Amino acid sequence: QQESVLRAMFDAQAGAGFSAMKTPIAGTDFMSAGPFYTYDPVPGDVQMKHFSMARDLGPNGVITYIKRARRYGHFVLQAPMDYPPDWMLFNPDTNQDVNPKYYDALARYYLRYLEDYQKNGVFIDYLSLFNEPDVYTKIPYKEITVLLRDHVAPLLEKSGLKTKLMLSEAPDRDDASTNYPVLMDDAGARNYVAVMPYHGYDFKEYSKIGELHRRYPDVPLWMTEVCYAYEAGTPKSFALPRYEFADGDFWGQQIFNDLENYASAWIYWNAVLDEKGGPWSVSYIHGNPDPNIQHPVIIINRETHEVTYTGLYYYLAHFSKFVRPGAVRIETTGNYPGVRVMSFKSPEGKTVSELMNSRKQDVEVAVVENGRTLRLKLPAVSITTAEW
């Protein structure tokens, strides 16, 4: 059933048409193809002579998966890194900071990743230097500024690759609001930043993103990671993964809140996991950060091979299928308790409205634009797309 799952995710006609995806640089806490890894574990290899993409090229590797997925539809890729090779750190046991003497080597590491992916037919649209720098590689933003401005960006520019740079990904909205100005107020660094990405693990501080937009209105904001996870602290009251369709309403609220505060992309962490909310990886140095049981967009049972498309899948699909790249959010006014509406103008000039009914009963509403009225009955706890 793998092909049917890929079609359901990436085909914009027969499926959701997901148009923005996150792919990790080497090892991450959720991997199915063996133990934790980096592309160059050889200590002191500053010229990347031992750099190897072999894991990603295997039959279950990331490159192989991306190529299969792209048979069904195009999507942009953004790539963050949890950890650089351990030998670049001051203290691998605590993931403590990158030694500045290895900044050039780390820049080469990023470039080799981008070049090798492109040689193998996969272009990375956006590079994030670090995933949650306060959580994984513990590197201050003032040092990220130096690394990006003086090492990574000049090398990338010289290479001729068209990959754009993202600011590293903060674990929540408050962290982004507090720390991003350190880099963004540095004129030399800001010139290289194409997107400000952030994660949604606070589940509440949406206004902080609106503040960032008003401060830097020319730089797009992307919500690039969020999930249900026990280790993240929310929630703890029910078993994961979730099979209830009504669960999608929770995620619909998250999407609405982020987009209303000027996010222009929304990416969920972990598209497909098994019935146990895994697999997760164990690193011999970084230890066992799990069991980090999480809720995916799609659940595949390893024993029965049953595929479950969660409520989250369908709510996400309403946006990704109908609000295509290039659409612009337009002002929507009106109020009905328990009902939210958000509208967009497509590149073709069509109006697309997403209407979410969180009430436990059906609701009748009217959508009015330029004297035209569209009357709709919204089922209880549902999302509806109107296009005209």
Ranges and model annotations:
Residues 42-59, 92-107, 131-145, 167-171, ...:
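The substrate-binding groove and active-site-proximal loops of carbohydrate-active enzymes
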Residues 318-322, 331-370, 377, 381:
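Carbohydrate-binding surface patches
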Residues 19-25, 29, 76-80, 125-129, ...:
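Structural recognition of the beta-strand scaffold that forms the well-ordered cores
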Residues 171-194, 230-240, 276-278:
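Substrate-binding cleft/loops of secretory-pathway carbohydrate-active enzymes
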Residues 220-315, 331-332:
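Aromatic/acidic polysaccharide-binding cleft in carbohydrate-active enzymes
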Residues 54-58, 62-64, 143, 154, ...:
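Glycoside hydrolase catalytic-domain groove-lining segments
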Residues 1-124, 146, 150:
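N-terminal catalytic cores of secreted or lumenal carbohydrate-active enzymes
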Residues 87-186, 205-214:
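Active-site cleft segment of glycoside hydrolase catalytic domains centered on the general acid/base Glu
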